[in-house]
Swiss-Prot record:
Catalysed reactions, semicolon-separated: tRNA(Leu) + L-leucine + ATP = L-leucyl-tRNA(Leu) + AMP + diphosphate
Motif 'HIGH' region mapped to chain: 40-51
One family name in Pfam for this protein: tRNA-synt_1_2
Name by which UniProt lists this protein: Leucine--tRNA ligase
Length: 864
């Protein structure tokens, strides 16, 4: 008899939906388990078989936890803002809201076909105004806050205003002004100062501009779009930024609070990129008209300062125009133009040939003022990282070495060691050639020399010890229509203010007919003339709304909180419910989000923690990345390769339980695995064997016998209970399924069908293959759904083996084995071994020189 999967799966999916089987009792007194998938972007292509891998894993664990007595929160929603829907609208004229809704409907249909136990009453979409009302609310809180470096936390901007009123900028790393001066500043002057502290601010910066997309890209997004074939160039624009760098230390330090894959922790650490060293000013040889006294650089190797032979400034550094001599102006401007067309990714490519141009100007080495240092520009230095300038020590830095060799610049060793065709950058050797009338560090090691240089620079007030981060502030504006409107208004007076919170959500203008970027660097919202105009409710002043929208990452920064309380119209989440359910106990999703979504959401969560609206420092306690599922050709699934497998086709032919079981049986969850249609067929055959185990005869009637199980049958059962019960929480789904298969293989040949044993087996199968399990449970006479049943507990008495297997070696080579009582004595074990037929034949006529016995495991007979 073949398992009628289509009929069974259709029935139970409808049953679960109608009975709301998986709705969370959010105020339950049971222990909680919050199990979350990274919600998908609903693309037009729909799901492929790679998507259900992570969803199935979390579903198995969610079902298991319910059976273990937990109240489980397992929701699903849609990260639905983004470029693809808008680009489709530009091509077809169909509004992004329409295509997004259609895509969501298709994704939901596909996900429901898999039989996943989501609480659909909590479904959300980042494009829903009722949702992004609170995305905008969080944005306003960020805008109205600053990061207090003394307390290392965010505070209301009002506390900063009060501070300025009381003591000016004292005790802050900022240009000095007194309390009296603050009070005399105009509103615009005050706002300019406050914007230097706000967690959301505007800045004129070189951005990653994609002409084809008509928008800027965050640093973290560039590689993805270049890989898709888009050209990304650097272009100066005024953009909204989020001051994520203020949280760099906490983002790094608090990684110790989470249980995440070591590779992801390492990626975040590297992206944040903490380094300690010296920030020091190299004075100009000739004073500039602007009065600037020199160029600041940051170095992690103060001990090599005597080895500086040139300086490199980023081509886009504002100082370049001032320091370029008339003779070098044309070359410098040509180089600036060429470098502006390159992305940061291109510029940081280590293997590319070094290029650059001399500016014609010099600085002096502060540690050795008689040493003139030529100033060059080169695109391997980025203005957005550090100070935008470096001291070049070619003897002890590989990139500097390659640049110096290219342009014939001096290479001066100041650390003991041999320079061949690579720079020598040891931290274990001592300093040489490092002495002047200012200071000497000759003979000192790295640590001592660095400390001495830093102390000297601080005493001279030309430098200071500093901690620096590779992390840069988050470019938060996009020149697109399909994103959350930024709830700010710009007024002719020069002031920018958020709209009142009572007016949230600020919705997108629905009747916009043109979705293409304006071509001026503004978003299509600039074309919505009526929507643009805003009258300040307090002053009556007419302002213009901000036309940029938020990036796709905004909505995903906090969605895990909204699932807890999705219908609350007043708060993004009830405080008591947040305290009960946070943090997320398990978060599953792709490793590609390690330095995007995961970093951004941690940043927002820490801010929300600072302002007292969440109770945990980290949002996700445990994180797992599922491995990619490749095509059958072992290449990444892609339309262009024609190797995409649609789950609809698999479910239509083999059923959802087959898809679920196979994806979990392919191998460890985190591994990359190729798809195999033959593998699905094998799992489908297994489910049919399970079905036949419970059915018998030509009439295919259901059969379970009210008979006492044998001891052997109970041993098989309880061994399976223990194995499956241990493997599920450890995500060892493949070995758990293997044990279920062993169980079926043990029982299939027998004509016995003990109800106690086989009913328990159904409970073990349920998290993996819920449709067939529900059907078998119902047919065995149970009226309630499996979702309310308890997971079986293994009985220790059936896990104890009464016999042990002992192997027999002769001269160290395996010759035979036998079973013996667990408490067999050494003498009896050796006697049994000697009397085995194989062993007797080998020993015939030989002398046993030694008998070695490893209790309960091994006997080795040494013969001569």
């Amino acid at each position: 008899m073949q398992y009628p999967f289509q009929e069974v799966e259709s029935f139970w999916q409808k049953f679960w939906e109608e009975n709301k089987s998986f709705q969370t009792n959010i105020r339950s007194s049971k222990p909680k388990f919050y199990c979350l998938d990274m919600f998908p972007y609903p693309s037009g292509a729909g799901l492929h078989v790679g998507h259900p891998e992570g969803y199935t894993a979390t579903d198995i664990l969610s079902r298991f936890k319910r059976m273990k007595g937990f109240e489980v929160l397992h929701p699903m929603g849609w990260d639905a803002f983004g470029l693809p829907a808008e680009r489709y609208a530009m091509q077809t004229g169909i509004h992004p809201a329409i295509t997004t809704k259609n895509n969501i409907d298709n994704f939901r249909r596909q996900i429901q076909m898999i039989g996943l136990s989501y609480d659909w009453s909590r479904e959300l979409s980042t494009t829903d105004p009722d949702y992004y009302k609170f995305t905008q609310w969080i944005f306003i809180q960020l805008y109205q806050s600053w990061f207090n470096p003394e307390l290392k936390k965010a505070e209301s901007i009002e506390t900063l205003i009060q501070r300025f009123s009381n003591k000016g900028s004292a005790d802050l790393d900022y240009k000095p002004f007194s309390a009296q001066e603050w009070k005399q500043f105009s509103l615009v002057e005050k706002e300019k100062i406050l914007s230097d502290f706000r967690l959301v601010y505007q800045a004129e910066i070189p951005v990653n501009w994609c002409e084809a997309l008509g928008t800027v890209l965050a640093n973290e997004e560039v590689e993805e779009w270049i890989d898709k074939g888009y050209e990304v160039v650097r272009k100066p624009m005024r953009q909204y930024m989020m001051r994520i760098t203020a949280y760099a230390d906490r983002l790094l330090e608090d990684l110790k609070l989470v249980q995440w894959p070591s590779s992801t922790l390492e990626m975040q650490k590297n992206w944040i990129g903490k380094s300690e060293g010296l920030e020091i000013t190299f004075p100009f040889k000739k004073p500039l008209k602007s009065g600037s006294d020199g160029i600041r650089i940051f170095t992690t190797r103060p001990d090599t300062i005597f080895g500086v032979t040139y300086m490199v400034v980023a081509p886009e550094h504002p100082i370049v125009s001032e320091i370029t001599t008339p003779e070098q102006k044309q070359k410098v401007e040509e180089y600036q133009k060429v470098s502006s067309l390159k992305s940061d990714l291109d510029r940081m490519e280590l293997t590319k040939e070094k290029t650059g141009v001399f500016t014609g100007s010099f600085v002096l080495n502060p540690a050795n003022p008689s040493k003139e240092i030529p100033i060059w520009i080169s695109d391997y230095v980025l203005y957005g990282y550090g100070t935008g300038a470096i001291m070049a020590v070619p003897a002890h830095d590989q990139r500097d070495y390659e640049f110096a060799k290219t342009f014939g610049l001096e290479i001066l060793p100041v650390i003991e060691g041999e320079i061949t065709d690579v720079a020598f950058d040891s931290k274990t050797s001592i300093c040489i050639h490092s002495s002047s009338s200012e200071i000497s560090i000759d003979g000192l090691d790295y640590s001592s020399a660095s400390s001495k240089i830093i102390s000297w620079a601080e005493s001279k007030r030309i430098g200071k010890k500093k901690t620096q981060f590779k992390l840069r502030d988050w470019l938060f504006a996009r020149q697109r229509y399909w994103g959350e409107p930024i709830p700010l208004v710009h007024y002719p007076s020069g002031i920018t203010k958020p709209i009142p919170e009572s007016e949230l959500p600020l919705e997108l203008p629905p009747n916009l007919e043109e979705f293409k970027p304006s071509g001026t660097g503004e978003s299509p919202l600039a074309l919505a003339k009526e929507w643009l105009q805003y009258k300040d409710p307090e002053t009556g002043e007419i302002g213009t709304r901000e036309t940029n929208t938020m990036p796709q990452w905004a909505g995903s920064c906090w969605y895990y909180l909204r699932y807890i309380d999705p219908k609350n119209g007043k708060l993004f989440c009830d405080p008591d419910l947040e305290k009960k359910w946070m943090p997320v106990d398990l978060y599953v999703g792709g490793a590609e989000h390690a330095v995007l979504h995961l970093l951004y959401s941690r940043f927002w969560h820490k801010f929300l923690y600072d302002i007292g609206v969440v109770s945990t420092q980290e949002p996700f306690a445990k994180l797992i990345h599922q491995g990619l599922i490749l095509g059958e050709d072992k290449r990444k699934m892609s339309k262009s390769l024609g190797n995409v497998i649609n789950p609809d086709d698999v479910i239509r032919k083999y059923g959802a339980d087959s898809l679920r079981l196979f994806e979990m049986f392919m191998g460890p969850l985190e591994m990359v695995k190729p798809w195999s249609t033959r593998g699905v067929e094998g799992v489908f055959r297994f489910l049919n064997r399970v079905w036949r185990l419970f059915h018998t005869g030509e009439g295919e009637s259901f059969r379970l016998d009210e008979i006492e199980p044998t001891t052997e049958e109970l041993k098989i059962l309880h061994k399976t209970i223990q194995k499956v019960g241990e493997d599920i929480p450890n995500f060892s789904f493949n070995t758990a399924i293997s044990q279920l298969m062993i169980f079926v293989n043990e029982f299939t040949p027998s004509d016995r069908r003990p109800k106690e044993v086989l009913e328990t087996f159904i409970l073990l199968l349920a998290p993996f293959a819920p449709h067939i399990a529900e059907e078998l449970w119902k047919r065995s006479g149970n009226n309630k759904s499996l979702s309310t049943e308890k997971f079986p507990e293994a009985d220790p008495q059936y896990l104890v083996e009464s016999e042990i297997l002992i192997v027999v070696q002769v001269n160290g080579k395996l010759r035979d084995e036998f079973k013996a009582p667990k408490d067999v004595s050494e003498a009896d074990a050796i006697s049994i071994a000697k009397n085995l037929d194989k062993i007797k034949g080998i020993l015939d006529g030989k002398t046993i020189r030694k008998e070695i016995y490893v209790p309960g495991k091994l006997i080795n007979l040494v013969i001569g």
